[in-house]
């Protein structure tokens, strides 16, 4: 009761001393319950030297951490002794609990609304003073950032398209934009710093990912690289690109058929070891589910829900690619994808904070006037507008560029 009353006074920005504490306890008819005015006065006699308050607080924090480690040890021991638990599951429990302790986070349960809104107002005020249009991690594309203000922490972002639209290329181009330094060694505008990205590639090998990034970053055609038909200029461009890529904090895991639990454990470990700002998955439908599941829909639901959980636990945006059903091909006239086309489960739409489709008309219409043009269709955004915008796509180097609506625009 005494501490709760002191906390109330602090939340009301009122002074905390013996007089105000006694007065507030009297108003609540709790003064006698806590020992009376004499006990409150005696508490002041036991106050240690305030000059060492930081050291005292550190001791309390350290003891709290040790107690939590003891509790964690008991929890892991019980899980290990419980027959139904698989070793990998026990390891995941241990890592998850240890991560929370290391990050200083605990499961607080219910939080009163006034504390939530006060924190909201502080965040809004900070954004107002910062005066930035991008409050999350930049996408590398101006119009995308205008719609989203960047990728936000704890968001599950789904990038979906039919085959050959450039899903993997678009995802990796975003990684390149935020993680690879410029020739001068700094971040690319509008990024304020270089970010670290963890990529789970279930479709392509890490070597294939590396070749694509070399082509995209150097501007040297994929075909020329694979055929070994490189000029002296090509070699120079590739060498420069390789130097920049070597400085990027992009980590690729190409384990096939990974499940959510293993992905979470690897991402958590990477964040603890080197830091992690974003996770990317290529792609959702290739992930595995442990145990028996009644239907494919339930499998996908379990995966999408798990990916959202990873984003929340690690407090970062998670970008996942997703396949679409064949419905766009079956529609006559307009083949642009819709939310109903998300393959095998409506839960992807429900779990995602943002769903964006990639559409290139030239894939369906060879005579289109929009050759080399891609549309990014933001079909769902939980905390922002929906709409679409255009990008330029160069298939020879699998790279997307900002779209400039001038007839003589050529990507650099």
Which role fits each region the language model picked out?
Residues 1-64:
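Noncatalytic partner-interaction/assembly domains of nucleic-acid and motor enzyme complexes
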Residues 146, 177, 181-275, 289, ...:
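Cytosolic-facing regulatory segments adjacent to core modules
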Residues 276-320:
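Helical hairpin unit composed of two closely spaced alpha helices linked by a short loop
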Residues 45-117:
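Interdomain "pre-motor" coupling segment immediately N-terminal to P-loop NTPase/helicase cores
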Residues 89, 100-155:
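Pre-Walker A segment
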Residues 163:
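The conserved Walker
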Residues 167:
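Conserved lysine of the Walker
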Residues 225, 259-276, 305-315, 327-412:
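C-terminal regions of RecA-like/P-loop NTPase motor modules
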């Amino acid at each position: 009761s005494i501490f709760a009353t002191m906390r109330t006074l602090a939340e009301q920005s009122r002074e905390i001393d013996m007089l105000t504490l006694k007065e507030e306890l009297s108003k609540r008819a709790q003064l006698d319950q806590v020992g009376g005015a004499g006990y409150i006065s005696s508490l002041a006699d036991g106050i240690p030297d305030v000059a060492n308050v930081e050291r005292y607080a550190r001791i309390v924090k350290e003891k709290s951490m040790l107690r939590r480690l003891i509790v964690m040890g008991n929890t892991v021991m019980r899980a290990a002794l419980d027959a139904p638990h698989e070793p990998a599951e026990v390891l995941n429990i241990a890592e998850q609990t240890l991560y929370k302790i290391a990050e200083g986070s605990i499961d607080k349960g219910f939080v009163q609304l006034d504390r939530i809104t006060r924190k909201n107002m502080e965040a809004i005020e900070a954004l107002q003073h910062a005066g930035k249009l991008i409050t999350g991690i930049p996408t590398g594309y101006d119009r995308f950032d205008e719609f989203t203000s960047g990728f936000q922490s704890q968001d599950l972002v789904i990038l979906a398209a039919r085959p050959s639209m450039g899903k993997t290329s678009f995802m990796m181009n975003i990684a390149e934009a935020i993680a690879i330094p410029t020739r001068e060694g700094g971040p690319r505008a509008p990024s304020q710093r270089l970010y670290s990205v963890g990529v789970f590639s279930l479709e392509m090998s890490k070597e294939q990912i590396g070749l694509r990034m070399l082509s995209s970053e150097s501007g040297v055609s994929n075909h020329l690289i694979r055929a070994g038909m490189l000029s002296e200029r090509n070699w120079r461009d590739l060498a420069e690109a390789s130097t920049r890529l070597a400085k990027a904090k992009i980590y690729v895991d190409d384990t096939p058929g990974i499940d959510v639990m293993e992905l979470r454990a690897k991402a958590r470990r990477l964040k603890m070891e080197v830091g992690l700002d974003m996770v990317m998955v290529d792609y959702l439908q290739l992930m595995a589910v442990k145990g028996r599941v009644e239907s494919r829909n339930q499998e996908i639901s379990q995966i999408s829900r798990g990916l959202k959980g990873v984003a929340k636990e690690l407090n970062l945006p998670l970008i996942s690619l997703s396949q679409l059903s064949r419905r766009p091909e079956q529609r006559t006239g307009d083949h642009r994808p819709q939310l109903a086309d998300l393959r095998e489960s409506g839960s992807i739409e429900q779990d995602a904070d943002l769903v964006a489709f990639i559409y290139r008309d030239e894939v369906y219409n060879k005579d289109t006037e929009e050759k080399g043009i891609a549309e990014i269709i933001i079909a769902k955004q939980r905390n922002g507008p929906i709409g679409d915008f255009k990008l330029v796509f160069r298939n020879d180097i699998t790279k997307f560029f900002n779209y400039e609506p001038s007839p003589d625009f050529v990507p650099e």
